[in-house]
Each structure stands twice: as structure tokens, then as C-alpha cells.
Amino acid sequence: MRKVRDIMSAAPVCMAPGESVSAAARAMKQQGIGTVLVLTDGMLTGLVTDRDITVRVLAEDRDPRTTPIGDICSSHLVVLDPDDDLVLASRLVRDHAVRRIPVLQDGTPVGVVAVGDLALESGATSVLSGMSSAAQND
């Protein structure tokens, strides 16, 4: 059975909660990702997504240059272990209505699993699989 480690995006981008939303957005653009993990003293304390930036900063007319990511990140997180199976990962995505799940090994972030990763794994006939493998808009 395939494991989370087989499909996760490794080496997640991590930032401190005091970093600006602008810095997080730049990192997302440079890395071609939609998630930055928020670490406090090396421990995962939050997750900020491109959607969080849109909904919690831009839509509320907050200044992304001065708003810290710690103020907008999600802090009630669902996490996976690299050795968890993909059935569990899919169930957590569905049950918690999340699109991205941090992967921790011994408390240290080692990756992120996105709903797109799971869709690609589900096979070429999946509509989500086709959407997930399409070229990104830049």
C-alpha cells in the first residue's frame, strides 16, 4: 500500500509567525506552491494558504506588507505522518474539509500532502487528476 511519503511534496516552505504576508506570498510564487507552514521555535503552529491571503487579508483591506502570517494562519491543524497510508490521508481531507495537510516526522515538518496529490494518485480517469496535472497560471 502506498504511503504519504510517496506522494507528499517534500521540503515544505516554513516561516516564523512574525513574517509578513507579502513575504509568504513571494515564497509561494517563487516555489510554485500554495502553502507556507508557520513554525514557532521549530514547532508547527500554523499553516497559511493562498486562499487565507485572499480571504483574510486582501478581502479585508489589510496591508500584506505589515500583516504577520501568524495573524491569519490556521492553527487547528490536521497532520499526517510519512508512513500513514493514502486511505487515511484521503479520509482526513474529506472529513476535515481541508485541501492541504502538513506531514510531520517526530514533530518536524517534512512535507505537505495536497488534495491534488491525492487526486493524481487516484488515477488518470479522475476529473480531479486532470485538473491537478494541468499547467498552473502564473
Where are these regions (language model features)?
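Tandem CBS (Bateman) regulatory domains
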Residues: 1-11, 49-79, 85-94, 112-138
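Short hydrophobic/aromatic-rich motifs at helix boundaries and adjacent loops
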Residues: 7, 25-27, 40-42, 60-62
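The conserved cystathionine-beta-synthase
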Residues: 14-32, 80-97, 103-104
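A glycine-centered beta-loop-beta connector
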Residues: 28-31, 36-52, 93, 101-116
